[in-house]
Regions:
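Class I Rossmann-like S-adenosyl-L-methionine
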Residues: 3, 7-167
């Protein structure tokens, strides 16, 4: 089932939250390699205020645009294979931590509630632990060589950074 169908099914029954919608879009993008702008625009045609639309757009594009940096920060805290919903929720949460002025307690609370709804209580505990661990230990880029540091900090593929550096 595509995101569009899922949204249309869910809308009449519950009042969707911005982060839930952003997560649905990110999951659809990851699983189906869908066009982000089309999926986002379709999701935003529903009853959202301008500020809610802004938050959804910021969360979706921000998470994707900074993905390499967010993955770099997440990587050492993952000790098991994550489901797509868990990985995308963690990346979106880390985006809020590093780039938005969202308090950590709010990020963790919202993430845990979302994952408990979608998976189970145990997954909520895992998300809680991973986020707290990530918030305590931010990885430095200083130990990386110049090209790797530039690749991760700008979230551009290493091959592209090397190509531009060589010119």
């Amino acid at each position: 089932m595509s995101l569009w169908h899922a949204i249309l099914i869910r809308i009449p029954h519950i009042n969707m939250k911005e982060r839930d919608t952003a997560l649905d879009i990110l999951i659809d993008y990851e699983k189906n390699e869908s066009y982000l702008n089309i999926t986002l625009n379709h999701a935003l045609t529903h009853d959202f205020s301008p500020s809610e639309r802004g938050l959804i757009t910021t969360l979706v594009y921000g998470t994707i645009q900074n993905r390499l940096y967010l993955e770099y920060q997440l990587e050492p805290h993952i000790h098991t294979r994550l489901k797509v919903v868990e990985r995308m929720l963690l990346l979106m949460s880390l985006y809020q931590h590093f780039y938005l002025d969202t308090p950590d307690y709010a990020i963790v609370n919202e993430a845990v509630e979302i994952i408990k709804e979608r998976r189970n209580k145990r997954a909520g505990g895992m998300i809680n632990a991973i986020l707290h661990s990530c918030f305590k230990e931010t990885r430095s880029l200083d130990d990386l060589d110049h090209d790797e540091r530039l690749s991760i900090s700008t979230s551009h593929p290493l091959w592209m950074v090397k190509m531009f550096s060589a010119q």
